[in-house]
């Protein structure tokens, strides 16, 4: 059989393994890299279990997370795959967004069925906006009973449905160890799993396709020319002479026109997501704009003051608080480029939150911030990060 020709311009998808401890997340990751390496050697490196399991520590917004990144290619796509070995690491990663996932492989051991962490991981995936989950039913080499497999599959589908995931998602029976040992039946099961990823996980929406948004980092005046703002374009594309809206932090938003776009001292016609750009804004004074506001396509974004968030509170060892906090806690919420004070309301029945906990909270900010669901923030006290979270719902 002729090897499939690989295209260099394949769509890129971020993916990860989630599921209960000891159900085989890391072994599954290792099996995927080995099987793809054996199938398409030019495009893929094999990663051994140990290399993935002993993940280097990463710092994301001041939080230390053990997380492993591997990459691989199928015929259709290029994947970046994250595997967070520990349960606490997984939670921290999901909430701080050290790695965004476009889809997840939920690993469930056929010998156990769904366990408490399986449920918790699916719930968290829903809260933090992982768009799609499919299932690798692992350790199938250890189960001879077809009825038992069907039962486990049913339970997993119920669990997905509970969190509004696709109840009809692929559930692929695999044996990660069998595949690593080279047993052809299980090697094929991993190829089947990857085919399911290719076909079921939707192509991610690219940041450039969304309406233009750039957080303001710096402002300065160029004598005789006007006010320039700089920042990194977060979303969309901006063209020269486009009308933009400046919003957030202040009561009213302002409209203006971009009369020049510069990057690395070169004049450009456009700036797009990922670019560090300097924009010259027509008719604006230095005091008309401040750090923490956003420059955006008019009407595309709205500032809000009240929201709900999913938050991980740093432990003392991570440089967080040494003591719990209570209802009406008033820290700073750091969105994009600035701190805004907010008042915290804890959920009913929660009297206090300990360092190291994760919690759902309602927040009322004293100044509006342009936000939508999924926006990440840090919680700070005097410039020190004590928590990390993301917006799960906007209330006002």
UniProtKB/Swiss-Prot annotation:
GO molecular function, one term: GTPase activity
Residues that bind Mg(2+): 26
Region (G3): 83-86
Reaction(s) this enzyme catalyzes, per UniProt: GTP + H2O = GDP + phosphate + H(+)
EC numbers on record: 3.6.5.3
One GO CC term on file: cytosol
Domain named tr-type G: residues: 10-205
Region feature (G2): 62-66
Region of interest: G4: 138-141
Region (G1): 19-26
Family, per entry: Belongs to the TRAFAC class translation factor GTPase superfamily. Classic translation factor GTPase family. EF-Tu/EF-1A subfamily.
Protein name (Swiss-Prot/TrEMBL): Elongation factor Tu
Organism of origin: Corynebacterium urealyticum (strain ATCC 43042 / DSM 7109)
Underlying gene: tuf
